[in-house]
Amino acid sequence: LEIPDINSYNLYFGWYLGELEQNDEFFDEYHEKYPDRAIGFSEYGADANPQYQAAAPEKGDYTESYQAVYHEHILQMIEKRPWLWATHVWNLFDFAADGRDEGGKHGENQKGLVTIDRKTKKDA
């Protein structure tokens, strides 16, 4: 079986499934098993509605507070793994997504670091 020269994984541990730490575990286990293969993080993010805040944020609560926790964890994880060849936050801006009705907003993916109108930088 031939594999590509590089691989990237689109993981959402800590948002759609599992816990944040599973991102760390996945990449560490992959790198330990295949130390000579390039691996990247092709997509990661967590939805946030800036109107939602929490003193004790939790996965799936759509709070700006949890989005900040999520990205702080991911950035620390990336910083500790210089062997990751690429990382891609999803997404710079919130964007239209007609089929979505989550986090208090219909028709919008709220994984952006900035609101859909480009006016509010989220605390991520």
Regions found by a protein language model. Name each.
Residues 1-124:
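Extended substrate-binding grooves/exosites of carbohydrate-active enzymes
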